[in-house]
């Protein structure tokens, strides 16, 4: 455990600080860090050592969850660059995206009211495709250092993930 708890998540796993992550390398590095900090290795250690090992394990878990999920990784990367996504406070979106949001919400509501699982499935496919395309665009924005636009893209992706989740739940409810 030569690294320090204050190290950024990328440094913890020895990865380059970038949006694109080699998932196999991340998984391998995570297993290495976890094995070094596993509580069983410190069962006979003193309280202070066990506490530090638990902090390391918790830090590694949080780092792994963050870097494994593209949207969380992008938000974290922007934070490292001094950019606060402000998802709670900054809801400014382009008029085109606002219109798209309304269309998706309306399609969701109508399909639920009509119990049209096939339309919900189609909406879910559309949302997942939109999400894939936007993640690719987000990667390009981050790689280009366009942090402001990347922050806007993150906020849009948060909305898309929310409606994707709502659509998935609606399908589950209707299929029960």
UniProtKB/Swiss-Prot annotation:
It comes from the Bacteria. SUPFAM superfamilies: Chaperone J-domain (SSF46565), HSC20 (HSCB), C-terminal oligomerisation domain (SSF47144). Signal peptide: none annotated. GO terms for biological process: [2Fe-2S] cluster assembly; protein complex oligomerization; protein folding. GO terms for molecular function: ATPase activator activity; protein-folding chaperone binding. InterPro entries: DnaJ_domain, HscB, HscB_C_sf, HscB_oligo_C, J_dom_sf. Co-chaperone involved in the maturation of iron-sulfur cluster-containing proteins. Seems to help targeting proteins to be folded toward HscA. Belongs to the HscB family. This is Co-chaperone protein HscB homolog. It comes from Cupriavidus taiwanensis (strain DSM 17343 / BCRC 17206 / CCUG 44338 / CIP 107171 / LMG 19424 / R1) (Ralstonia taiwanensis (strain LMG 19424)).
């Amino acid at each position: 455990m030569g690294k320090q708890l204050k190290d950024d998540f990328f440094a913890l796993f020895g990865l380059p600080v970038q949006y694109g992550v080699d998932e196999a390398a991340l998984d391998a590095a995570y297993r290495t860090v976890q094995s070094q900090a596993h509580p069983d290795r410190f069962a006979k250690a003193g309280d202070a050592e066990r506490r530090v090992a638990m902090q390391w394990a918790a830090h590694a878990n949080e780092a792994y969850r963050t870097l494994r999920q593209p949207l969380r990784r992008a938000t974290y990367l922007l934070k490292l660059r001094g950019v606060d996504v402000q998802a709670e406070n900054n809801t400014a979106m382009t008029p085109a995206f606002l219109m798209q949001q309304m269309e998706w919400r309306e399609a969701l509501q109508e399909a639920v009211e009509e119990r049209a699982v096939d339309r919900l499935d189609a909406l879910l496919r559309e949302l997942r495709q939109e999400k894939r395309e936007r993640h690719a665009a987000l990667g390009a924005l981050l790689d280009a250092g366009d942090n402001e636009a990347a922050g806007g893209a993150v906020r849009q992706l948060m909305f898309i993930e929310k409606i994707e989740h709502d659509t998935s739940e609606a399908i589950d409810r209707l299929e029960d």
